[in-house]
């Protein structure tokens, strides 16, 4: 409580407020562009495939060429905010939210493990917000709800595995 709400200067408290600040632009842009970008571009396979390939190449280059200077606990507000802002690009079909945030973190010199940890923490508020926003559209779709729950559980295992893998 003291670390988070009272903003005591601990790494956990600081990172909590960084996550809050980094979530706002992605959420706002996503809310504003939801009907325009997703509906229009979502039906264009060439856009989706191109975005996926381009972002994959950019992530590969960023991971190989960027220095790994910054650890999780040393990330700055600027780094965390720009990583959060980059989430907005995920509204382009074919652009992975995790991929674009990992790319941004690596381009800013954050090491792999720290970028992955921050990316996964950052996913919680944005995914939860998007789920609540779209809740009315799928609340009575039982197969969809089962799929979401299964994806969540699987995702937790994958995140744990990936974080362990990135430590190596």
Identify the role of each PLM range.
Residues 1-96, 100-168:
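Multi-pass membrane proteins that catalyze or facilitate reactions on polyprenyl-/lipid-phosphate substrates
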């Amino acid at each position: 409580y003291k670390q988070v709400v009272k903003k005591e200067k601990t790494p956990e408290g600081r990172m909590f407020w960084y996550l809050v600040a980094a979530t706002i632009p992605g959420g706002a842009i996503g809310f504003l562009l939801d009907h325009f970008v997703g509906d229009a571009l979502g039906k264009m396979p060439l856009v989706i495939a191109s975005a996926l390939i381009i972002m994959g190449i950019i992530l590969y280059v960023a991971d190989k060429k960027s220095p790994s200077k910054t650890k999780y606990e040393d990330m700055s507000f600027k780094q965390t905010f720009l990583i959060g802002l980059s989430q907005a690009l995920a509204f382009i079909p074919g652009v992975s939210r995790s991929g674009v945030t990992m790319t941004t973190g690596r381009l800013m010199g954050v090491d792999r493990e720290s970028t992955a940890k921050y990316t996964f923490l950052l996913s919680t508020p944005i995914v939860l917000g998007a789920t609540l926003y779209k809740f009315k559209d799928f609340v009575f779709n039982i197969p969809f709800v089962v799929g979401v729950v299964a994806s969540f559980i699987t995702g937790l295992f994958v995140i744990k595995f990936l974080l362990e893998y990135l430590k190596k």
